[in-house]
């Protein structure tokens, strides 16, 4: 399963520095607008300590973590919805992503010039949201008359037309369709590929003064709720990537952080996309597989191979916690912790699974 988060932000907020840290790529990170033109894509492993334990238990030769894909997209400016700057390319690249990850600058640095001349997180967020909302308004302005005509001739299209009209009202009120939640049935509007229906995740690129200020962090979280928010220092994250684990832990402790910001970001990305993982293990590999929350066992099996879904018979399932408590698969079976589940079983995060299928 390949789902991606598009990293967006105004110029000079630290997008490419963050992306470099995520992927250890040397993407051009220059102090001028549009240093990123073609989107750069990077795949980052989702940190999962459970895999090392499974590999130890099963004698696995290698560990394969679930991938999280990030796309670094050109910096946006006011007027992007009208094609200003690299607006048209920006909007096209965003449409191809499954979620929007906005980097917001909250660090002070006189050597890195903010495009608007001042650091104002609320304003930065509003600029990008406004451009995305305007683009959606333009899409709906063309679509609503067409959908109205279709609804007159085909009653099945009536619900789509009504959802589009509701979406217009939400956008006119200055709210993104993601923030509107259940007020708009976004599933009905999937054919329009509206930008603000995509889930939002905010990354506040902060310095030590902000990272150590609980009140400021709470204020910024409230600013973007109900979306998830991650707080990190992109420069520090870049430095951490060059250090061994012991030195990295010392650096994190010195700035009062308990874990790498990138680990928090990868998990938040998974949460934003409503994803989870199930686990498989054997002599060759211990592996995490990405599925949607709510997926059934056959659907999950299909992530490994489509034949597994088509010929699904049953799944042997044990929770990771029950397996590790037992100490081995044999002991877990003896303790009655391994279950046989059928096609209607809804998967849970951390299920350790072996599928039975016939093709």
Regions found by a protein language model. Name each.
Residues 24, 56, 92, 96, ...:
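Short, intrinsically disordered, mixed-charge
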Residues 1-84, 88-111:
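Conserved G1/Walker A P-loop phosphate-binding module
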Residues 2-8, 13, 19, 146-348, ...:
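C-terminal-of-GTPase-core extension/linker across diverse P-loop GTPases
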Residues 22-32, 39-41, 46-49, 53, ...:
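Residue-level signal for pocket-adjacent positions within structured domains
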Residues 36, 86-87, 117-120, 218-221:
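Glycine-rich, phosphate-binding/catalytic loops in enzymes
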Residues 42-47, 74-84, 95-157, 170-183, ...:
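Conserved Switch II/interswitch segment of TRAFAC-class P-loop GTPases
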Residues 34, 48-51, 64-70, 84-97, ...:
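Amphipathic alpha-helical transducer elements in NTP-driven molecular machines
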């Amino acid at each position: 399963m390949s789902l991606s988060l598009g990293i967006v932000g105004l110029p000079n907020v630290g997008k490419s520095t963050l992306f470099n840290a995520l992927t250890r790529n040397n993407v051009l990170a220059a102090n001028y607008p549009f240093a990123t033109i073609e989107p750069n894509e990077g795949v980052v492993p989702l940190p999962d300590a459970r895999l090392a334990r499974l590999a130890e238990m099963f004698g696995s030769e290698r560990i394969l973590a679930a991938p999280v894909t990030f796309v670094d997209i050109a910096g946006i400016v006011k007027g992007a919805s009208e094609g200003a700057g690299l607006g048209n390319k920006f909007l096209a690249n965003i449409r191809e992503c499954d979620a929007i990850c906005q980097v917001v600058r909250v660090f002070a640095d006189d050597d890195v010039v903010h495009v608007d001349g001042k650091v104002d997180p609320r304003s930065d967020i509003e600029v990008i949201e406004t451009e995305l909302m305007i683009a959606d308004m333009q899409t709906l302005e063309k679509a609503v008359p067409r959908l109205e005509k279709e609804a007159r001739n085909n009653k099945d299209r009536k619900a789509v037309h009504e959802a589009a009209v509701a979406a217009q009202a939400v956008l006119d009120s200055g709210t993104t369709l993601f923030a509107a939640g259940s007020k708009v049935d976004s599933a009905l509007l999937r054919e329009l590929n509206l930008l603000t229906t995509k889930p939002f995740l905010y990354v506040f690129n902060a310095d030590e003064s902000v990272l150590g200020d609980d009140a400021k962090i709470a204020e910024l979280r409230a600013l973007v709720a109900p979306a998830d928010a991650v707080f990190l220092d992109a420069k520090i994250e870049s430095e951490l990537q060059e250090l061994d684990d012991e030195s990295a832990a010392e650096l994190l402790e010195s700035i009062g952080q308990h874990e790498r910001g990138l680990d928090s970001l990868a998990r938040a990305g998974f949460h934003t996309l409503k994803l989870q993982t199930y686990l498989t293990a054997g002599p060759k590999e211990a592996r995490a597989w990405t599925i949607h929350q709510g997926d059934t066992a056959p659907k999950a099996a299909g992530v490994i191979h489509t034949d597994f879904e088509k010929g699904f018979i049953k799944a042997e399932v044990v929770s990771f916690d029950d397996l590790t408590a037992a100490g081995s698969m044999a002991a877990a079976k003896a303790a009655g912790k391994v279950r046989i589940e059928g096609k209607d079983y809804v998967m849970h995060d951390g299920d350790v699974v072996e599928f039975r299928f016939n093709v």
